[in-house]
From Swiss-Prot:
N5-methylglutamine sites (modified residues): Q237
Disordered as annotated region, ranges: 284-306
Gene: prfA
GO cellular component term, pick one: cytoplasm
SMART domains, alphabetized: PCRF
Modification after translation, per record: Methylated by PrmC. Methylation increases the termination efficiency of RF1.
Compartments, as annotated in UniProt: Cytoplasm
Predominant subcellular localization, coarse grouping: cytoplasm
Protein name listed in UniProt: Peptide chain release factor 1
Family under the similarity heading: Belongs to the prokaryotic/mitochondrial release factor family.
Described function: Peptide chain release factor 1 directs the termination of translation in response to the peptide chain termination codons UAG and UAA.
Biased composition annotated in UniProt, kind: Basic and acidic residues: 284-296
Length: 361
């Protein structure tokens, strides 16, 4: 391993010990905000410190085994050669782990996220599929103990959704769900199809990190056009009495956000502004990412949200993840929320791309 990497790891080890000492300080314990921040930092350092300690131990084992080679005893020499082989193999594995653990992390990976699902080509069948995707993500969120809150929903005429926007809150939400952005295609026989022909429909999924208020882009109120209207859908008689739904248009960018899920106009406005801030930030991030990747296309984290990323083929029970040429015949499990079988390989591919970019740099 390079000396520069070893020095960085030693610095992280020292910082880990500092943080551990601070966490037992009475003043820090009394300051809940600082205690939480340090606890989070300690948790983030834990894996890399554990791997680095194991790496150091393997180095010591290798040195001891090499000393043993100088012995005259033939059995000891044989044992030493075996231990050297094991120690070198362990060092190779740990070096790979440490390289991945030291990769630059997207600071937004720990953020909550807005998940948008929109029906595309395919009419009613696309809306029904959007409903199926929403159910799939709901199951995945339940498995991860994440909270889902519907911000806006426009239901399809025959089920599902023309569009649905939800906020997902929890640990590491954006870091996992960001890989879902893109075009999702379904191939299946609709219930209304009497000939048994397979139809193809599509939905677009967009995942954006929630931007904390302190970090949010300043939005000039003069750049906003705000309309109120009566909410449609669930809500009983209430929906006919008050203009509680909100539509906000950001004039410079043309971005439009609607929120009508809350009964209070004030709450709908707050939610709409939160989604608007995330969308504007996403556009800014997209511009920057495009500039950074002008010389190198990132296979997995491609910003092209219209790009087809996945196909769900119901007759064959198959899911195809096009970005990494992954095919799984586990469609029913995936639709029930078992997304880690896809997200795990996507994350690994992303890490490999980052490592390649670092080595090129």
């Amino acid at each position: 391993m390079k000396d520069s990497v070893i020095r960085k790891l030693e610095g992280l080890l020292e910082r880990n010990e500092e943080v551990l000492a601070l966490l037992s300080d009475a003043e820090i314990i009394a300051d809940q905000e600082r205690f939480r921040a340090l606890s989070k930092e300690y948790s983030q350092l834990e894996d890399v410190v554990k791997s680095f300690k194991a790496y150091r131990q393997a180095e010591e084992d290798l040195a001891s085994a090499q000393e043993m080679l100088a012995e005259d005893d033939a059995d000891l020499k044989e044992m030493a050669q075996e231990e050297i082989k094991e120690a070198k193999a362990t060092l190779d594995v740990l070096e790979g782990e440490l390289q991945i653990l030291l990769l630059p992390k997207d600071p937004k990976d720990d953020n909550n996220a807005f998940l948008e699902i929109r029906a595309g080509a395919g009419g009613d069948e696309a809306a029904i599929f959007a409903g199926d995707l929403f159910r799939m993500y709901s199951r995945y969120c339940e498995a991860n103990r994440w909270q889902m809150e519907i911000m806006n929903a426009n239901e399809g005429e025959h089920g599902g959704f023309k569009e649905i926007i939800v906020k997902v809150s929890g640990d590491g939400v954006y870091g996992k769900l960001k890989f879902e952005s893109g075009g999702h295609r379904v191939q299946r026989v609709p219930e209304t199809e009497s000939q048994g022909r397979v139809h193809t429909s599509a939905c677009t999924v967009v995942v954006m990190p929630e931007i904390p208020e302190a970090e949010a882009i300043e939005i000039n109120p003069a750049d906003l056009k705000v309309d109120t209207f009566r909410a449609s859908g669930a809500g009983g008689q209430h929906v006919n009495k008050t203009d509680s739904a909100i539509r906000i248009t950001h004039i410079p960018s043309g971005i439009v956000v609607e929120c009508q899920d809350q009964r209070s106009q004030h709450k709908n406005r707050a939610q709409a502004m939160s989604v608007l801030a995330a969308r504007i930030q996403a556009v800014e991030d997209e511009k920057r990412r495009s500039e950074e990747e002008s010389t190198r296309r990132n296979l997995v984290a491609s910003g092209d949200r219209s790009e087809r990323v996945r196909t769900y083929n119901f007759p064959q029970g198959r899911v195809s993840e096009h970005r990494i040429n992954l095919t799984l015949y586990r469609l029913s499990e995936v639709m029930e929320g078992d997304l880690d079988a896809i997200l795990g390989p996507l994350m690994q591919e992303n890490q490999a791309d980052l490592l390649a970019a670092l080595s090129e740099g």
